[in-house]
Amino acid sequence: MEIVDYKCVYFTFGRFQPPTTGHAENFKAVKNTAKGCDWFIYLSQTVDNKGSNPLDPDRKLYYAKKMFPNFAKHFRSGPKDPVAILKELQTEGYDDAMFVVGSDRVQAMQWVKRYNGKDFFFRKLDVISSGDRDADGD
């Protein structure tokens, strides 16, 4: 009998503009949910001059690593959206991918599963909750 060892990854993706202590709860949830699988925190590339996305990607990554050194090696910046992230993860050899989002975003992010088998292929792909968002997290 052949034993198949699937390579799994858990990830989250967000603006994190700017990174806050409230985001740390999301980061912890990704780590804890991964249970032995690889896990990453993707920082969006979004930046504008309107005030809601003031940090450019490099500056945001710098602050995230300074604020959360325990998560520093798991931060990634580059792919601009969840589909691009999943394409990247597939090229890295992952078989299973779990997109971890706040409970208020689970339904809204189900659309990524429509691309499985088209733009990328994962044996298992799901969108799961990191838990309820802390309204007071700053």
Q: Model features per residue range: what roles?
A:
Residues 1-138:
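Nucleotidyltransferase catalytic core that binds NTPs
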